[in-house]
C-alpha cells in the first residue's frame, strides 16, 4: 500500500545525487517534459481513489504474467474507480503475455486521456522502461 517517492530535483530530470540528510541547493530549472510527466502522475495519485494511501486506497491485486522478473502488472480498485498498471521495469524489450480476466474493458490512459481497450488477453512487446497506466470509474 506504499507509493514511490519523488526526490528533490527528479521532477525536473535532475540526476545529481544529493546528500541524504543535507539540504543541497537545487539549481534553477525550467519546467520541461519531465516536469509535466510528474505533474500528471501526481494528479493521478490525487484524483484516483484507488491510489489513496492506507485503508482508503484500493487493495493491490497482482495480474500474473509470463515475465515477472521484468513486468509488473497489477490492479488497485475501490468502489469509485479502478487503476490498472502494466510496467516493464527492465531496460529490455519484453514479450508480455498474460490474461487480464475480469479487468478487461474500456479505460482511459491515465497520462494522455486517450480512450483504450484492455483486452482479456495481452500479447504484445513492451519496450524497456515502458508502461501503461489505465483508469476508469466504477
Show the residue positions of the predicted features:
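Carbohydrate-interacting/catalytic domains
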Residues: 1-138
Amino acid at each position: 500500500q506504499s507509493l514511490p517517492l519523488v526526490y528533490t530535483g527528479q521532477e525536473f530530470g535532475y540526476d545529481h545525487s544529493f546528500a541524504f540528510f543535507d539540504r543541497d541547493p537545487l539549481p534553477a530549472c525550467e519546467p520541461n517534459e519531465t516536469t509535466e510527466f510528474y505533474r500528471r502522475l501526481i494528479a493521478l495519485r490525487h484524483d484516483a481513489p484507488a491510489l489513496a494511501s492506507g485503508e482508503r486506497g484500493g487493495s493491490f491485486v497482482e495480474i500474473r504474467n509470463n515475465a515477472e522478473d521484468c513486468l509488473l502488472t497489477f490492479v488497485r480498485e475501490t468502489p469509485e474507480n479502478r487503476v490498472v498498471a502494466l510496467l516493464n521495469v527492465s531496460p529490455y524489450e519484453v514479450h508480455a503475455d498474460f490474461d487480464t480476466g475480469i479487468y478487461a474493458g474500456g479505460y482511459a490512459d491515465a497520462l494522455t486521456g486517450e480512450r483504450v481497450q484492455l483486452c482479456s488477453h495481452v500479447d504484445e512487446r513492451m519496450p524497456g522502461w515502458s508502461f501503461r497506466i489505465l483508469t476508469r470509474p466504477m
